Design a protein with these regions (language model features):
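Short coil-to-beta-strand
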Residues: 30-37, 100-107, 144-145
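Hydrophobic alpha-helical segments and helix pairs
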Residues: 80-123
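Structural alpha-beta junctions
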Residues: 101-102, 177-182, 246-254
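Long, positively charged, glycine-interspersed low-complexity recognition regions
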Residues: 198, 203-208, 213, 218-258
Length: 258
């Protein structure tokens, strides 16, 4: 098995620590063969906090290029960004993609039909919210702008009762991923958050078992993502738990998106 990770942050998003080289050094130490750096993309129009500033982007990409040059004989390093989906920004995604090796969809906000309000996925409270989130994610996937779907089961993070809406949502997302042949991520950071915030819970905030049992019914590739916000925890017990979680369900896990 080759160790890889394509979901990695750094200090520029203002809620992670470490620079690009810090993560690269850990990846090499842990025997990784590939590492994707994918910090939160600048979106000055929305959600200015918790993501890099527009003026930081060129330096961010340059830092990755410097790491590629310095460590390229030891590990393959890729340039990426994790970004929200807003249909009015399709040209922005194309602009970013020209500078990147791949683009990650991380859907933390969603919209309802006929409503341009940006709703927070962490505040999903109703079955209608769940379905709206899933339909919006499917729209994003089918836009063809994204190469990797981070934490697709995020909609259950605070909606704890798996019900018919959750099941339908999982089918909607899985169908879109299968149609576009885009991998869905089993996210290790959801396991970290579970242990830190809800140690008494009998399941993870995400990955959510019932969601992934539905994914398994489709011809969908899956990938394990660390979603590392701390280079000291990029390869930790939660990453191994995520790998075992995928093995137990029998998911079609890929090691690389290339």
């Amino acid at each position: 098995m080759n160790k890889t990770n394509f979901h990695t942050h750094n200090y520029r998003c203002e809620h992670a620590i470490g620079n690009v080289e810090d993560y690269v050094k850990v990846a090499i130490k842990e025997g990784y063969t590939e590492l994707g750096i994918s910090d939160h993309a600048p979106m000055p129009e929305y959600y200015e906090n918790n993501r890099m500033k527009e003026e930081d982007l060129d330096r961010y990409l340059k830092e990755i290029e410097e790491a590629q040059e310095k460590y390229g004989d030891k590990i393959k390093i890729y340039k990426s960004l994790e970004i929200e989906y807003f249909p009015e920004f399709l040209e922005k995604y194309d602009k970013y993609r020209k500078k990147l090796d791949y683009l990650v969809l991380g859907l933390h906000a969603f919209r309802k039909p006929g409503d341009n309000t940006n709703y927070n996925a962490w505040k999903i409270k109703t079955g209608e919210d769940v379905l709206d989130y899933a339909k919006y994610m499917a729209e994003a996937i089918e836009s063809g702008k994204f190469d990797y779907i981070a934490h697709p089961d995020l909609y259950v993070i605070n909606y704890r009762n798996w019900d018919e809406s959750c099941e339908k949502a999982a089918h909607i997302i899985s169908e879109a991923a299968e149609k576009m042949d885009v991998p869905l991520e089993v996210n290790a950071n959801g396991i970290r958050k579970s242990f830190e915030r809800h140690p008494d819970w009998d399941r993870y905030m995400y990955p959510y078992k019932e969601f992934w049992e539905i994914v398994k019914q489709y011809n969908v590739r899956t990938i394990i993502g660390s979603d590392a916000h701390d280079f000291n925890r990029m390869e930790d017990r939660e990453m191994e738990i995520a790998r075992e979680f995928a093995r137990e369900i029998g998911l079609n896990v890929i090691e690389s998106i290339f």
